[in-house]
């Protein structure tokens, strides 16, 4: 059986290091003798149920570690279930029982170090490149046992569409990018051209060929296929590493890029500049025959550079961008790749690119900023030195990214440990049941304190295009190292809330100097328009988005402001100002005023706010209403709040809930789920947004209806059902936050019970 380990290293691994004793680290190991026959049967049954229902509920319920934790803690639900009939009203007693049942269950899922483990995955292009990298470097068998391979294949089979393809993410339609990547992954893992469960390979290849073959794969796919040797580098648009030696004032200098974009194209430019191609094995030669409509040797690579399947095209490239790529391809690249320029410029650029890669690797303990970047940086280190320590350090951190659930093994974005725990702590504190869960609160408080970043990136970080990080919180754990504004805001807010409670219940409070550091981070990330960026200060011109090199995502070139980050910062700084009125008060007051104005300006015509990190307008509106309320705005004096309330009330379904399609994110208009389908997480968001607006004083009936749906959705165990994925990024890709189904319904019930008058 597979088992989740918490906060552990890799034994005496000399290539693994940490800043805080691995707090928050999550790794899976397989025990061939583990589990009783009954426990093994329960895992088999969970897998069967998921597979049988995979086209209806595409996100896993994240059951494997949950069953493990509940078993280890001998969990038993002792609080009787409650249901509210159509003719009945929600009472204080009913709400309290449902809340306590949910908290009792959720508390049993807390890890020993204080965080809540959870899947944070869903994109179907995360895992295959890792398999490609290990295949190229010859470490596939060393890293992936037969059990790993079995579970990776299970995941691929579970998320194959009925038409034979794979979507960009688990909820989406089939795309050339992910169908090709997952097909090649199956072949590398030993499946024949027509093998795999239910003829998975044959069906996938049929989809690929019927949609034009892999010449229509998007640019990221062209890059990975070129690295594998299944494509030719001359069929890709240039990614010259010489950009790294441009003067910093140059408009398209990498320093002006969004951090994730910069960190993707850093190793890509190195591999492109090297024209690196992995070993041409018999499998690679066979794939060249399987994936094209014409013989490989007859393909005109120059003409396929701009091809992209319509199923993959979310951001059609403007003409100006194609002119840029053509100019680089025809005029610049032939010179840069030949003597003397390859010695004068290219070699220097490649060395500088590797310097940046090593710097980023070291400052993230070889986790890197995310899974896409992790694999590319790892491969670049191997290309530089196959036997070097840099590559070995990367190998030691692969297990941090792997996650197991009933749908198989997948690769995480990089873990949401701090993010989920910050939300969870706010939900539990809102319950006003602190005396019943003091141990849970104390552990969570300790984890949050331990996860705060204690230093800036090493050395002259500004020359490496990095921002301050001292005092920040990351999305995952401290070792990751990358500051995020809303994670910092939630970490700060939690510490402030804990400081208002007795230390004998929640433990000692965080040092005020550490809180001052986090305030400094937040103040540094506000833009001139009042909005809050996520990772680094904004400043690059908006027109650079015209050069977005991906066809699948939007707004990836430069850093942007986000309503959710802005709201989170307002909430944290408003509370900080109350508790520490003498620290940078003038700056904080001005910050909140400008941030509230930004939120008002970002409201759409229908009264909603676009959600950048959750689906979608329901999520964004919850955050915006919470932020405006924290800034002191009310329904009576703020038109934006009134319009936001009107939007939420109009979107409420007859059953009392809310249900929004992930298509809202890409279409940028509100699209309800078909029929009377409500999502319990989105219902919780809407309920909390309305409560923040003061709806209880005006008309509590919509709140009662929403609470009734949440209460009646609760399962016998105190858990809530897994429904559609509710996270998103880059406008076009969903992300599954498996802990959301517990955190947000509990948070909403806690707010409802505390702030709405009940009989």
Curated annotation (Swiss-Prot):
Query: What are the EC numbers?
Result: 5.4.99.39
Question: Which GO biological process categories is it annotated with?
Answer: triterpenoid biosynthetic process
Question: Where's the active site on this chain?
Answer: 486 (proton donor)
Superkingdom of source: Eukaryota
The record's GO CC annotations read: lipid droplet
**Keywords, in A-Z order:** Isomerase, Repeat
Q: GO terms for molecular function, please?
A: beta-amyrin synthase activity
Q: Start-end of the PFTB repeats? A: 149-190, 592-632, 641-682
Per the record, what are the reactions this protein catalyses?
(S)-2,3-epoxysqualene = beta-amyrin
Q: How is it used?
A: Saccharomyces cerevisiae expressing Glycyrrhiza uralensis CYP88D6 and CYP72A154, combined with the expression of Arabidopsis thaliana beta-amyrin synthase (beta-AS) and NADPH-cytochrome P450 reductase 1 (ATR1), accumulates glycyrrhetinic acid (GA) and, to lower levels, beta-amyrin; these GA production was increased in the presence of G.uralensis cytochrome b5 (CYB5).
* Top EC group: isomerase
Q: Which InterPro entries match?
A: SQ_cyclase_C (IPR032696), SQ_cyclase_N (IPR032697), Squalene_cyclase (IPR018333), Terpene_synthase_CS (IPR002365), Terpenoid_cyclase/PrenylTrfase (IPR008930)
Q: What does this protein do?
A: Converts oxidosqualene to beta-amyrin.
Instruction: Identify its protein family.
Output: Belongs to the terpene cyclase/mutase family.
What protein name does the entry list? Answer: Beta-amyrin synthase
Q: Which organism is it from?
A: Arabidopsis thaliana (Mouse-ear cress)
Which lineage ranks, top first, belong to the organism behind this chain?
Eukaryota, Viridiplantae, Streptophyta, Embryophyta, Tracheophyta
């Amino acid at each position: 059986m597979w088992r989740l380990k918490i906060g552990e290293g890799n034994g005496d691994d000399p290539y693994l290091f940490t800043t805080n004793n691995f707090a928050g680290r999550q790794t899976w190991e397989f025990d061939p003798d583990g589990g009783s026959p009954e426990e093994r049967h329960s895992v088999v049954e969970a897998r069967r149920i998921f597979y049988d229902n995979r086209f209806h509920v595409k996100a896993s319920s994240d059951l494997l570690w949950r069953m493990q934790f509940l078993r280890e803690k001998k969990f038993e639900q002792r609080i009787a279930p409650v249901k509210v009939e159509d003719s009945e009203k929600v009472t204080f007693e009913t709400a309290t029982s449902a809340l306590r049942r949910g908290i009792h269950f959720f508390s049993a899922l807390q890890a020993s170090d204080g965080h809540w483990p959870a899947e944070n995955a869903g994109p179907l292009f995360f895992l295959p490149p890792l398999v490609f990298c290990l295949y190229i470097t010859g470490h596939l068998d060393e890293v992936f046992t037969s059990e790993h391979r079995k579970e990776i294949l299970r995941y691929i089979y579970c998320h194959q569409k009925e038409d034979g393809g794979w979507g960009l993410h688990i909820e989406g339609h089939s795309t050339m990018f992910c169908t090709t990547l997952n097909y090649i992954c199956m072949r590398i893992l030993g499946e024949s051209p027509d093998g795999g469960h239910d003829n998975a390979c044959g069906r996938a290849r049929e989809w690929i060929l019927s949609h034009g073959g892999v010449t229509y794969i998007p640019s990221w796919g062209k890059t990975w296929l070129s690295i594998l040797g299944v494509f030719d580098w001359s069929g890709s648009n240039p990614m010259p590493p010489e950009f790294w030696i441009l003067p910093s004032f140059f408009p398209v200098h990498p320093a002006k890029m969004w951090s994730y974009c910069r960190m993707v194209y850093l190793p890509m430019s190195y591999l492109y500049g090297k024209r690196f191609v992995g070993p041409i094995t018999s499998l690679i030669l066979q794939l060249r025959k399987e994936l094209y409509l014409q013989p490989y040797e007859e393909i005109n690579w120059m003409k396929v550079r701009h091809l992209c399947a319509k199923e993959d095209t979310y951001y059609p490239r403007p003409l100006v961008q194609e002119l840029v790529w053509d100019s680089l391809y025809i005029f610049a690249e032939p010179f840069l790749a030949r003597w003397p320029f390859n010695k004068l410029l290219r070699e220097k650029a490649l060395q500088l690119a590797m310097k940046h890669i090593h710097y980023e690797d070291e400052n993230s303990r070889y986790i890197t900023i995310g899974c896409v970047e992790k694999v590319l940086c790892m491969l670049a280190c191997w290309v530089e030195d196959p036997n070097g320590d840099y590559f070995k350090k990367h190998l030691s951190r692969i297990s941090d990214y792997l996650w197991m659930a009933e749908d198989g093994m997948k690769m995480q974005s990089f873990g949401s440990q701090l993010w989920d725990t910050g939300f969870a702590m706010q939900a539990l504190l809102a319950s006003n049941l602190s005396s019943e869960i003091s141990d849970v609160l104390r552990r969570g408080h300790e984890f949050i304190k331990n996860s705060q970043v204690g230093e800036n990136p090493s050395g002259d970080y500004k020359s490496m295009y990095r921002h301050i990080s001292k005092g920040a919180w990351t999305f995952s754990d401290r070792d990751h190292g990358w500051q995020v504004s809303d994670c910092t805001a939630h970490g700060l807010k939690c510490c402030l809330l804990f400081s208002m409670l007795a230390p004998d219940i929640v433990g000692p409070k965080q040092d005020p100097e550490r809180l001052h550091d986090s305030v400094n981070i937040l103040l540094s990330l506000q833009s001139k328009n009042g909005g809050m960026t996520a990772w680094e200060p904004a400043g690059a011109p908006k027109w650079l988005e015209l050069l977005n090199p991906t066809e699948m995502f939007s707004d990836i070139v430069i850093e942007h402001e986000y309503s959710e980050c802005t709201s989170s910062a307002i909430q944290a700084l408003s509370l900080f100002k109350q508790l520490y009125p003498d620290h940078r008060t003038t700056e904080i007051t001005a910050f909140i005023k400008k941030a509230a104005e930004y939120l008002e300006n970002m409201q759409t015509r229908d009264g909603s706010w676009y959600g950048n990190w959750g689906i979608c307008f329901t999520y964004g509106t919850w955050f915006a209403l919470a932020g405006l309320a924290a800034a002191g705005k009310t329904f009576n004096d703020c038109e934006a709040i009134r319009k936001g309330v009107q939007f939420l009330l109009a979107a409420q379904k007859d059953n009392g809930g809310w249900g929004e399609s992930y298509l809202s994110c890409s279409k940028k208009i509100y699209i309800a789920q078909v029929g009377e389908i409500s999502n319990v997480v989105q219902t919780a968001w809407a309920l909390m947004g309305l409560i923040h607006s003061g709806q209880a004083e005006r008309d509590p009936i919509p709140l009662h209806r929403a609470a009734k749906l949440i209460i009646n959705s609760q399962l016998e165990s105190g858990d809530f059902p897994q429904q559609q994925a509710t996270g998103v990024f880059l406008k076009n890709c969903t992300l599954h936050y498996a802990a959301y189904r517990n955190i947000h319904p509990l948070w909403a019930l806690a707010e409802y019970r505390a702030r709405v008058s009940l009989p």
